[in-house]
């Protein structure tokens, strides 16, 4: 029985895809580095900002790139992010059913809170684990285990919901069932290769998982 659901943020419950892609393109251009296509950027999304910028630039020290990224990201945050269908109504219903909820993300806390507040989702979250709250981010199990410890819940009665490969890997390493979202830019076929316990095509599919533990496919 699922008693707690942990959500990734970007690309899972808040549509930050265009903001993230635009921020990377800006950072590379501003620092006179070769440009990348969306298709080159998307596979890396979900890992830490440093890891992504290092992969894109070949640089170990990405501090200047991170500054460019965050500057663009903050400036264009509200205009470039959006919501996914039925997220709010699903959160409200899960809360009504007594399901506890939290966030596990590789974002920093300020932008995490900003996005949650913008879409009125913060009120549902009992714990928020960001990249600065852990020593080892996803795909390591530490972020998921930190959230579980904060909530004092059983890993086997917890569900992780995410849009990226590292979400699946982190949850599995923590001994937590995981649902991958079919609206991920990575593509459902790619996510299936990493064997999530569930694939959901609509946020309301979580009702059935909570009720029966029946796989959605």
Name what the model sees in each region:
Residues 2-89, 93-97:
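N-terminal helical cap/lid subdomain that shapes the substrate entry/recognition surface
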Residues 159-198:
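Acidic, Mg2+-coordinating phosphoryl-transfer loop and its flanking beta/alpha structural elements
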Residues 120-130, 190-207:
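Structural recognition of alpha->loop->beta junctions
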Residues 29-31, 51-59, 80, 88, ...:
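Substrate-recognition/cap helix-loop segment adjacent to the acidic, metal-dependent catalytic center
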Residues 4, 138-168:
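Conserved Lys-Pro-Asp/Glu-containing loop-to-beta segment of HAD-superfamily phosphomonoesterases
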């Amino acid at each position: 029985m699922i008693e707690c659901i942990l959500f990734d943020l970007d690309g899972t419950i808040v549509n930050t895809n265009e903001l993230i892609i635009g921020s990377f393109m800006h950072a590379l251009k501003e620092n006179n580095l070769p440009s990348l296509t969306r298709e080159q950027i998307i596979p890396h999304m979900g890992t830490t900002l440093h890891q992504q910028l290092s992969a894109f630039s070949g640089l170990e020290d990405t501090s200047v790139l991170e500054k460019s990224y965050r500057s663009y990201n903050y400036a264009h945050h509200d205009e470039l992010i959006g919501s996914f269908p039925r997220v709010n109504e699903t959160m409200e219903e899960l809360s009504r059913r007594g399901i506890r909820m939290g966030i596990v993300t590789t974002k920093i806390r300020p932008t995490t809170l900003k996005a949650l507040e913008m879409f009125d989702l913060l009120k549902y979250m009992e714990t928020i684990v960001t990249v600065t709250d852990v020593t080892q981010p996803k795909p390591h199990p530490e972020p998921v285990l930190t959230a579980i410890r904060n909530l004092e819940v059983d890993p086997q009665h917890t569900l992780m919901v995410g849009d990226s490969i590292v979400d699946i890997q982190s949850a599995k390493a923590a001994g937590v069932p995981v649902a991958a979202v079919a609206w991920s830019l990575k593509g459902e076929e790619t996510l299936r290769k990493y064997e999530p316990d569930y694939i959901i095509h609509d946020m309301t599919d979580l009702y059935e998982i909570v009720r029966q533990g029946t796989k959605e496919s």
